[in-house]
């Protein structure tokens, strides 16, 4: 629905970053239905690297967070607090990874959108 509204505004754009991969897959469907080639005309990127990102065509470029590591550390912290053990004095920084697939290309020369 958001992609339909965006296309309806009549403005030129060359890329869309979506909140998650499911929304990106929906946006890709709308673009395809409107005869817009992903990524040649519009690049598309998702977020979370769920299964659908590997099965849409073109395969979706996305951002992956280390969810299992994050969940494990959160569970360990919750258990420590539940057992009234002191919480570790550690700050955890989790770095995302760009998963390059086929839905993004470099902008065309002179494209400022």
Model-derived segments and spans:
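Flexible loop/turn connectors
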Residues: 4, 8-17, 21-110
């Amino acid at each position: 629905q958001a992609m339909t509204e965006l296309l309806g505004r009549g403005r030129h754009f060359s890329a869309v970053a979506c909140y998650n991969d499911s929304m990106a897959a929906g946006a890709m469907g709308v673009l395809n239905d409107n005869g817009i080639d992903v990524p040649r005309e519009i690049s598309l990127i998702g977020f979370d690297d769920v299964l659908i990102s590997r099965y849409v065509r073109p395969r979706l470029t996305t951002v992956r967070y280390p969810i299992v590591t994050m969940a494990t550390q959160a569970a360990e912290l919750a258990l420590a607090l539940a057992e009234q053990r002191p919480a570790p004095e550690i700050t955890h920084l989790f770095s995302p990874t760009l998963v390059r697939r086929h839905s993004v290309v470099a902008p065309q020369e002179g494209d400022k959108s």
